Amino acid sequence: MIHGSAIVSPKAKIGENVNIGHFTVIHDNVIIGNNTTIEGYCEIGYPTPLALNQPLVIGNDSYIRSHSIFYAGSTFKDKLITGHRVTVREKTYAGNNLQIGTLSDVQGDCNIGDYVRAHSNVHIGKHSKIGNYIWIFPFVVLTNDPHPPSETMLGVTIKDYSIIATMSVLLPGVTVNELSLVGAHSLVKDDVETGTVVAGSPAKMICETSSVKLREHPELSAYPWPKHFDRGYPDVVINQWRKTFGEKII
């Protein structure tokens, strides 16, 4: 259902069973997949020359909450979910089931994998590369300018299964390798090795992630986290984790 106050361009391609809320604007160069909901006061496909005439593509079964703005020129696969007042700039390419929390900002020219979870108030700078099954907690900032202000852009890379805890800042060009954990309030200026915990300002290696124990089961390692946490993930993913990481420990 399209609310009577919504403005939907006749050039936009709207799938089946799509709900568009009050006072939302859908611009020309937009493709919206089936069974998608866009709440009120959103602006979808905001025009910009930086999009190079490419459309905004929103996959099937997505849910965009109110007051969010998506620029033209980005592509999101199925089951995109946002909080309120999210801004996503052009040339952002994301896989399945990206979740972007309230008041988060994706600055564009980004590549984001499958099942990425970005909580509220996350800033993802231009040229960021984010892998699969990443968790980014509130107030994290991914930077890109090594000597601001300048024309140099060095995006941050976060590889599969890594976690960036709340209020951390990743400096330009940093790579966080697979299965790693960045502790809360960290300032990361150097690459993070695979399967390690770093924390502090500047961040230093603390230990291997396997040394971190579950609070309620101190005899068990908390990492890799798919061995004990799978809430919200589909069976096909969980079954693959069982093959990769072994049976669930709790």
Language model features with spans:
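Conserved catalytic-core motifs of eukaryotic protein kinase domains, centered on the activation segment
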Residues: 48-49, 146-148, 174, 208-209
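Short, low-complexity, polar/charged sequence segments that are solvent-exposed and flexible
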Residues: 60-61, 160-163, 215-219, 224-227
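Conserved beta-strand-loop-alpha-helix hinge in the C-terminal portion
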Residues: 194-219
